Amino acid sequence: MLPMITGFMNYGQQTLRAARYIGQGFMITLSHTNRLPVTIQYPYEKLITSERFRGRIHFEFDKCIACEVCVRVCPIDLPVVDWKLETNIRKKRLLNYSIDFGICIFCGNCVEYCPTNCLSMTEEYEFSTYDRHELNYNQIALGRLPMSVIDDYTIRTIWNSPQTKNGVNPLI
């Protein structure tokens, strides 16, 4: 008789514990009902990236001294640096610089270790192409100024929305 009573007590305790867990989950679900949705409609709306976002690499040809530090610190030896030694001034002259973003892992080592700061990470992240060879950027493509996400039309429309003006930030 005693084992049967303890079995019923254990069953009752387990039932109460399960009901409490279900209630906790339901309360979490209810607490999310008054929040704004986090999902955005990507092609039409874009999130503002953080300051430390690692996007497309921007390259300034005039600052580069062809030291090849970026190639040495890259885990996959990605940047291709072509240079020629100028014998009259005994310095390297940069001929060509290219990065294939189809292979790049966006680790940021090249930007961090560059002694002349000719490399920087931008907030550009849209690299969609139909041909993977278009992802190989030379110094001209790397040197073009990136379009800032904040200047994008969709960001400006979200920022000027009535929800933002009422003190509710739709991006958070």
Swiss-Prot record:
NDH shuttles electrons from NAD(P)H:plastoquinone, via FMN and iron-sulfur (Fe-S) centers, to quinones in the photosynthetic chain and possibly in a chloroplast respiratory chain. The immediate electron acceptor for the enzyme in this species is believed to be plastoquinone. Couples the redox reaction to proton translocation, and thus conserves the redox energy in a proton gradient. Belongs to the complex I 23 kDa subunit family. SUPFAM superfamilies: 4Fe-4S ferredoxins. Its cofactor is [4Fe-4S] cluster. One of its GO terms (cellular component) is chloroplast. One of its GO terms (molecular function) is quinone binding. It comes from Arabidopsis thaliana. PROSITE patterns: 4FE4S_FER_1, 4FE4S_FER_2. NDH is composed of at least 16 different subunits, 5 of which are encoded in the nucleus. The lineage of its organism: Eukaryota, Viridiplantae, Streptophyta, Embryophyta, Tracheophyta. [4Fe-4S] cluster 2 binds at residues 74, 104, 107, 110. Its EC number is 7.1.1.-. Binds 2 [4Fe-4S] clusters per subunit. This is NAD(P)H-quinone oxidoreductase subunit I, chloroplastic. Residues 55-84, 95-124 form the 4Fe-4S ferredoxin-type domain. Pfam families: Fer4_9. Disulfide bonds: none annotated. It is an enzyme of class 7 (translocase). It is a peripheral membrane protein.
